A protein has these predicted regions:
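Short, basic/aromatic beta-hairpin or loop at an interaction surface
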Residues: 1
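C-terminal terminal-subdomain/extension
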Residues: 4, 75-134
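Compact nucleic-acid interaction/catalytic patches
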Residues: 28-35, 40-78
Length: 134
C-alpha cells in the first residue's frame, strides 16, 4: 500500500533560501520518511515549476564529523539554542504538493529565509556530498 500525499501543497514556487516543511511520506528507509523542515536550494528550473530542489534540516547532530552535515548558525524554527543541521547528502527534488509553509498559529504561516552565510555553507555541503568538491 502506498502512502497518500495531500493534493494541495504550495500554490507557488518557493524562493531560494526559504525554509518550509516537506512531507517525505512514501519514501523508503534509510531515506527520510516523515515531515521535516527543508531549505530550498534554488529558484525554479525552466519547465520544472512543479518541483523544488530541497535540503532537509534536522536538530539531531550527526554521528560523525562529515562535511555534508552542516551546522547552521541558528535554529530557524524556534527561538531556543538547539542546534540545527543541514543534511546535504539528502538533497533531492520534491513535488510542490509535498511542501507547506511553517504553521505558527491559527491560519498563520511563515516562510523564514536562511541567511546567506549559512546558505553558502549548505551549497558547499551539497557539492561535497555529490562529489563536485574535493
Amino acid at each position: 500500500m502506498t502512502a497518500q500525499i495531500k493534493d494541495s501543497g504550495l500554490q507557488f514556487h518557493p524562493r531560494k533560501r526559504e525554509i518550509l516543511i516537506c512531507d517525505f511520506k512514501g519514501n523508503i528507509v534509510p531515506e527520510i520518511v516523515k515531515k521535516r523542515p527543508v531549505v530550498v536550494l534554488r529558484d525554479p528550473l525552466p519547465y520544472r515549476s512543479d518541483l523544488a530542489i530541497v535540503v532537509p534540516l534536522s536538530s539531531t547532530p550527526p554521528k560523525y564529523g562529515v562535511p555534508y552535515c552542516v551546522l547552521l548558525s541558528q535554529n530557524y524554527l524556534s527561538q531556543d539554542d538547539k542546534p540545527m543541521y543541514a543534511k546535504c547528502d539528502l538533497a533531492c527534488s520534491v513535488s510542490l504538493k509535498r511542501l507547506d509553509r511553517i504553521k505558527v498559529g491559527v491560519r498563520k504561516y511563515v516562510c523564514p529565509r536562511m541567511n546567506e552565510d549559512d546558505f553558502a555553507n549548505v551549497v558547499r555541503g551539497v557539492g561535497w556530498a555529490f562529489g563536485f568538491v574535493a
